[in-house]
Amino acid sequence: MESLIFIAPLAGVISLVFAAFFAKSILKEDAGNKRMKEIAGAIQEGAMAYLNRQYKTIAVVSIILSFLILFLLDDGLKIAIGFLAGAISSAAAGYIGMSVSVRANIRTAHAASSGLEKAMSVAFRGGAVTGLAVVGLALLGTSSFYILYGDVDLVVGFGFGASLISLFARVGGGIFTKAADVGADLVGKVEAGIPEDDPRNAGVIADNVGDNVGDCAGMGADLFETYVVTSLAAMLLGSLIIGTYENAILYPLVLGSVAIFASIISVFFVKIGKEGKIMQALYKGVGGSAIISLIAFYFVTNSLMGDIRLFYATVVGIIITVLMVIITEYYTSTDYRPVKTIAASSETGAATNIISGLSIGFESTLVPTVVIVIGILISYFIVGGAADAGIGLYGIAIAAVAMLSTTGMIVALDSYGPITDNAGGIAQMANLPAQVRKVTDALDAVGNTTKAVTKGYAIGSAALGALALFADYRSKVNLGGQSLNLDDPVVLAGLLLGALLPFVFSAVTMSAVGKAAFEVVNEVRRQFREIPGIMEGTAKPEYGRCVDIVTKAALHEMAMPGFLAVLVPLLVGLILGPKALAGLLIGLIVVGFMLALMMDNGGGAWDNAKKLIEDGNHGGRGSEAHKAAVVGDTVGDPFKDTAGPALNALIKVVNMVAILFSSLIIHSGLF
């Protein structure tokens, strides 16, 4: 059984090989005419310039933190090396995804001239590169450091590095993409009355760059981190029950390995049938990945663990994944009541649109929360949690690992979104034939749904993963002679601070988007006013000015959320003690999960309500209802693409800080 540990790094390498294979196949596709290449080149240049500047900024922070880890912790050198490796791996996943995404967009636009099937194939393969790179690097890094160190506690540094990069990528990318999007929409659609992706809008290139920065690199880093820390949490909890299950640490890694093979196989399932239904084709891949993974999990569990109850926990994880996807699609798709309600409310103005959108966002927390609660209880008790709490908590962690078995496909779906969005923008700006735009519009409409669905999945997996991380922190606190009681005022104080943190964090990120969007709006207005011929199409806007504005804003504003995530748990732990920090973690997980659900689903519903009106309903484009829906969409944009997704990263970073510095915190504090 010992040799099975090497299946994990091998699976990681194979995943990266297939990612390279798909990337090479995309680059062989035709990149279109000169005008298309000019537009795509501007998007590519802006995206890579931002990513390079972001990583330089993060590198400075990472080096400072690595020295703190080196000098403050036992085995600091090993943990610091792991931390830097985790940060580099997460950055590499984002870099690979971004590099392919900004090259697949133009090829998708050109392929649209050959029809829907060809264009969809190029876009999905582009997404698959990011998906396979994310899971490959995550499993390769986690397993390699465990093999190298032989102690799962020392692998925590790798998880912390992945978490920190994810937070910065989510916050910085979210500020960039939504400041550009909101600014471009408010002036272009509402004031100037020009369509989306119109080349006369100075913010249009920044908007297209932002799609890649936020939805490709951002989501890639987010799910890379979730994959790493959830696997790590299961391994940490497994180390506590090694007397019952000798392979408890190895089991999550083997599950991840077979799931990678399932994802690779399932990529080839994604083909449009005779009906021409794009979403159905994409769901074939996700469904195939889940089913193949479950079959493999059954044999792995029987041979490695000898306890069928653990297989049942993996089934729970897969069911949660399916339900989260269905629920999110219900609340964010144009086919169902929530989005139709918001669209109808737009007829009476922006105020009723906002009220309706907030209501739908709040409502959307109900069913997912019930699903997660039931999943937690079943996975805890089905493995024997009533008799042994440690095994029950391990069952929850295994359910979370099973949820992540579809990560490769889920990231592929998410990255498909910005590729098709950019393809539509390139087609519009390059004045390609109406038939091409019709194909890219069909792809983009599905891309909006996939982006929303993957956010719901990310929140659910983050919640289960964070609960497993908290369980490990609690075990470390108990080992230090501390007990946790909810009637303890110190724990309650921590609970309130933890519940507060998501609101403060969201305030900072939302404010950053508002300030940057204000600058973009003023810049686009200035260009319309001062550069003659823009509206007539005889003069070219200064696209670079808007890209520069949002780049500077994103890099400047992402520092504060990062400091909050690292310093707050450290200060609470060092000043108030480990019990208060435990309370903070509980409050953060509960409130952060709910708030993220509300923001992601509410924002997605606002976005698609606008698109429903643009499709000719409730007066269509240019109507008063459309103007109200654009206002709602611009409120929902930072909800669903900045603050909401960043809360996932916040929850996991704070938990990783607590675990990493638990040995320091356990002997500190006033209480």
From Swiss-Prot:
Q: Which residues carry the site feature described as Important for ion transport?
A: R170, D215, D222, D641, K652
Binding, substrate: K178, K640
Which cofactors is this protein said to need?
A: Mg(2+)
Q: What are the UniProt keywords, alphabetically? A: Calcium, Cell membrane, Hydrogen ion transport, Ion transport, Magnesium, Membrane, Metal-binding, Translocase, Transmembrane, Transmembrane helix, Transport
Top EC group: translocase
Question: What's this protein's name?
Answer: K(+)-insensitive pyrophosphate-energized proton pump
Which GO molecular-function terms appear in the entry?
diphosphate hydrolysis-driven proton transmembrane transporter activity; inorganic diphosphate phosphatase activity; magnesium ion binding
Q: What does this protein do?
A: Proton pump that utilizes the energy of pyrophosphate hydrolysis as the driving force for proton movement across the membrane. Generates a proton motive force.
Q: Which family does it belong to?
A: Belongs to the H(+)-translocating pyrophosphatase (TC 3.A.10) family. K(+)-insensitive subfamily.
Chain residues that bind Mg(2+) 2: N208, D211, D421
The protein's topology relative to the membrane is: Multi-pass membrane protein
Instruction: Report the record's disulfide bonds.
Output: none
Name where it's found. Cell membrane
Which reaction(s) does its UniProt entry say it catalyses? diphosphate + H2O + H(+)(in) = 2 phosphate + 2 H(+)(out)
Q: Which gene encodes it?
A: hppA2
Q: Name one GO cellular component term.
A: plasma membrane
Q: Which HAMAP family match?
A: PPase_energized_pump
Quaternary context: Homodimer.
Which stretches are transmembrane?
3-23, 57-77, 79-99, 128-148, 156-176, 223-243, 249-269, 285-305, 310-330, 366-386, 391-411, 452-472, 490-510, 558-578, 580-600, 646-666
As recorded in UniProt, its EC number(s) are 7.1.3.1
For the keyword tRNA-binding, the answer is no
Per the record, where is site Important for potassium independence? K451
